[in-house]
Amino acid sequence: MNSNLLKKMKIKEGMVGKLLNTPPEFEEFERYLQENGYITSSNETDFTLCFVTNEDKISSCIPYVYDLNFDGLLWMIFPKKSSKLHSAISKDKGWEPLHEIGYKEIAIASVDDNWAALRFRSTSLIKSAKRKLKLFDKVANHRPNRLNPNIL
């Protein structure tokens, strides 16, 4: 499971990062990461994996977002609706703390029967967001032709 999960999350050999709020059922995964040199105490990381069940847990992970290298991998791992684990968040709700700092969900992966992971990325690095911003700027700066109101 360990190497398959890393592959799903695009974590490659040589990358280092943080694993936060690890539940007991993932202690073996945590040990695997530590023994294979994936976990670092440095403030410069390639990835952050954060287990969350509510917005407070998400907020506790935010300081580590700022440790990510340019376009580092940010994964929030949360209980699936089908699991018996209690959670105040789902793939569609509860991510406001990350939205407030300019991050948006871009991918989802199944971790196991009970957990799923959402990948977040800075909106400044998402191509569709850049296109929308360019279009908005173009429309906002457009001055209608005052001589002919039918021409935009």
Regions found by a protein language model. Name each.
Residues 85-87, 92-121:
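Long, charge-dense
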Residues 124-152:
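Flexible, glycine-/basic-rich loop-and-beta segments that form/coincide
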